[in-house]
Regions:
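Active-site-proximal alpha-helix that buttresses catalytic centers in soluble enzyme cores
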Residues: 2-91, 95
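Residue-level preference for the first positions of well-ordered beta-strands
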Residues: 5, 113-115, 151
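Short, glycine/charged-enriched secondary-structure capping and boundary segments
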Residues: 20-23, 65-69, 101-104, 129-132, ...
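Glycine-rich phosphate-binding loop signature in dinucleotide/nucleotide-binding domains
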Residues: 44-47, 107-111
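Alpha-helix N-cap/helix-start capping motif
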Residues: 56-57, 120-121, 148
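Short phosphate-binding loop-to-helix
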Residues: 91-109
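A glycine-rich beta-strand to alpha-helix segment
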Residues: 112-133, 139
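Domain-level recognition of soluble alpha/beta enzyme cores
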Residues: 134-169, 175
């Protein structure tokens, strides 16, 4: 079974004075871009089976807006307060690619499509580590930059527990804007 991993970098955040990095909210542009990212996922991937989100305010905000656009909120089993289809994981905040791989290895095997909402450089480094092969157009876009609201779609060729370097193929890379 080929699995799919969608790696979404959080939308553009604001920099209010006196606010810790972890607690920064989305900027107005980020609000629009997060919705656009959700629409892109809905139209090109579909609703994920499981979502892993950093505990940072901007990633949680990105997912909430994207989920609404996908139509994921209200789906059976969705409850932000309980484990299951949504995991808010503090390890994703400021994570290296190696840490993100560890987090993703914990996904249940029944998950066909997983979506990770995280930060750079972790998102970019994760995609580079996992993707043994790359669609040329996607690779060209990703080589330039992994901007806020950037979305990488990878086909994973192993069980989640076996995820590692070279175990996926980068299929698409997009940067939806609202």
């Amino acid at each position: 079974m080929t699995r799919r991993l969608v790696v979404l970098r959080h939308a553009k955040s604001a920099y209010p004075p006196g606010v810790l990095d972890h607690d920064r909210p989305l900027a107005p542009r980020g609000v629009a871009d997060a919705r656009a990212a959700g629409e892109w996922v809905r139209d090109h991937v579909g609703a994920p089976d499981h979502v892993v989100v950093s505990s940072a305010r901007r990633t949680r905000g990105t997912w909430t807006l994207a989920a609404g656009a996908i139509g994921y909120i209200g789906a059976a089993g969705y409850d932000a307060a309980s484990p299951g289809p949504l995991t808010i994981d503090p390890r994703v905040y400021d994570a290296s690619a190696a840490t993100l791989v560890e987090v993703l290895r914990e996904l249940p095997e029944r998950v066909g499509t997983a979506l990770l909402v995280g930060h750079n450089p972790g998102c970019e480094d994760l995609v580079a580590r996992l993707a043994a092969a790359r669609d040329p157009d996607a690779a060209r876009l990703l080589a330039v930059k992994y901007p806020t609201s950037g979305i990488a779609v990878l086909d994973v060729h192993v069980a989640w527990a076996e995820l590692g370097a070279g175990t996926a193929t980068l299929r698409r890379f997009a940067v939806p804007r609202g």
